[in-house]
Amino acid sequence: MNIDFHIKPEIRILGIDDSALLNEKVMIVGAVFRGGDWIDGVLRSEITKDGLDATEVICNMIKKSKHYDQIRTVILDGITYGGFNVVDIQMLYRETGIPVIVVMRSYPDFEKIKSALKYFPDGEERWTIIKRAGKIERIPGEKSPIYIQRAGIGVETVKKIIRLTSIRSNIPEPLRVAHLIATGIILGESRGKA
């Protein structure tokens, strides 16, 4: 069920991104924001590189957080973390009760993804999770569009949240800051784009 709801200017949003893939364990960082310009907290956990634990780890990270009852939306940087550790956004929504928005700078190349998944013994399972994430929708931006998937939230509400939180680029600030923190901690300095 995807619903639209009223957005307050200081809605609590959790943006999640991963760090560089330097080890078997990959750090994921969550930045808790009020709207798009006030950071309220930082969450951290680890997932297995190319594993299948991202959904469970993110669920636990959220549920164990002191911010859990305040978070109204989770924003993910794509659905693959730590290589091909795929997040099941429908399950993440069901387990936490918090709507999920997936943000992508460009439309995914599904043929390339399917080709890469052939090297995984559980590639079909990963592909099923990817398909379960649902339709990819284009959201126009000032300079360039972004692409989204969603669970438990209507597209009009997603557009409002994107507008509210995308204050320095077309990427929502909670996601941009999570990326900066994750790469900065692991690489010693932040780099790349969320």
UniProtKB/Swiss-Prot annotation:
Gene3D superfamilies in the record? archaeoglobus fulgidus dsm 4304 superfamily
Known InterPro entries for this protein?
Endo_dU (IPR002802)
Coiled-coil regions listed in the entry: none
Q: Which domain of life is it from?
A: Archaea
The record's family statement is:
Belongs to the UPF0215 family.
What is this protein's record name?
Answer: UPF0215 protein Mbar_A0619
Q: Please name the taxonomic classification of the source.
A: Archaea, Methanobacteriati, Methanobacteriota, Stenosarchaea group, Methanomicrobia
